[in-house]
Amino acid sequence: MVEELPSVFLVGPMGAGKTTIGRLLAKQLGRSFVDSDWYIESQTGADIAWIFAKEGEAGFRERETRAIDELTQQPQIVLATGGGAVMAAENREYLKQRGIVIYLNAPVDVQMARTAKDKSRPLLQQPNPRKILQGLYSARDPLYREVAHIIMPTGHTYPRHMVNQLLQQLNSFCISTSVDSEPEKD
């Protein structure tokens, strides 16, 4: 059943493991992996921090929406989105309608541990990053849940084990949706 999967889109906060899990999942599925932030960087020739500095968050979000639109139309990929991709209503629609969305749900403590020394995250280059992460989590968690077909807690197990769990959930999801979509027989 997993061969019949549409594209798989990973959403969640920064530090949730979207890139790590996405790479491993793509390898297991025999698919291409794309990180939307890397895609934006390759399209613009500039890194995310530079785009934020020159165009502000609004400029970056416009680029992100174009990228999400393009990438969600590619067949059978595994896509890791940026943490704020769900803020735009059109991105949420693209994700929900064009593939299976997995929400990697990482508690703020896990996010802090994974992003503490990362200087490439513009939103955290301010005093009190924990407060910023808590605010982002509170604002975005309902949106991640809105688009998610599958919710997977992160930070409590090894990435390879998580991928195995996701493969089982994806297989179950495919079975349940194919049964639901079959016409009823009289």
Swiss-Prot record:
Keyword Cell membrane: no
Co-factor binding comment: Binds 1 Mg(2+) ion per subunit.
Catalytic activity: shikimate + ATP = 3-phosphoshikimate + ADP + H(+)
UniProt cofactor(s): Mg(2+)
GO-annotated cellular components: cytosol
TM stretches of this protein: none
Origin superkingdom: Bacteria
Primary localisation category: cytoplasm
Family: Belongs to the shikimate kinase family.
Official protein name in the record: Shikimate kinase
Organism: Psychrobacter cryohalolentis (strain ATCC BAA-1226 / DSM 17306 / VKM B-2378 / K5)
Gene name of the record: aroK
